[in-house]
């Protein structure tokens, strides 16, 4: 199977084609907000992903947070 070259930004963590040379897809974490019914949850989403050897913490959990500001709350 074809692999993605180092620095390729089309990679998706845990999915899709693997990065070449044993590298992995790593990303920056960005705080995000989503609505679930009437409540809000804050969570971390992965952005600026690319193939390489740097390591970033995987934060996939969303948690209810009423102090979280969604864009439409501004």
UniProtKB/Swiss-Prot annotation:
Q: Give the free-text PTM comment from the record.
A: Contains 6 disulfide bonds.
Q: Where is it predominantly found?
A: secreted
Compartmental location: Secreted
* Name of the protein in question: Omega-filistatoxin-Kh1a
Task: Describe tissue expression.
Answer: Expressed by the venom gland.
Tell me which UniProt keywords the record has, alphabetically: Calcium channel impairing toxin, Disulfide bond, Ion channel impairing toxin, Neurotoxin, Secreted, Toxin, Voltage-gated calcium channel impairing toxin
Of the GO CC terms on this record, one is: extracellular region
Q: Which stretches are transmembrane?
A: none
Role, per record? Potently blocks vertebrate calcium channels Cav1 and Cav2. Is the most active on Cav2.2/CACNA1B (from HEK) (IC(50)=2.3 nM), followed by Cav2.1/CACNA1A (IC(50)=4.3 nM), Cav2.2/CACNA1B (from oocyte) (IC(50)=14.4 nM), Cav1.2/CACNA1C (IC(50)=26.8 nM), and Cav2.3/CACNA1E (IC(50)=96.4 nM).
Give the GO molecular function terms.
Answer: calcium channel regulator activity; toxin activity
Q: Upper lineage ranks?
A: Eukaryota, Metazoa, Ecdysozoa, Arthropoda, Chelicerata
């Amino acid at each position: 199977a074809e692999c993605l070259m180092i620095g390729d930004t089309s990679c998706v963590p845990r999915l899709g084609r693997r990065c070449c040379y044993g590298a992995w897809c790593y990303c920056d974490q960005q705080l995000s907000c989503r609505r679930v019914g009437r409540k809000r949850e804050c969570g971390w989403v992965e952005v600026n992903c690319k193939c390489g050897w740097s390591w970033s913490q995987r934060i996939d959990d969303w948690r209810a947070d009423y102090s979280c500001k969604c864009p439409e709350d501004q």
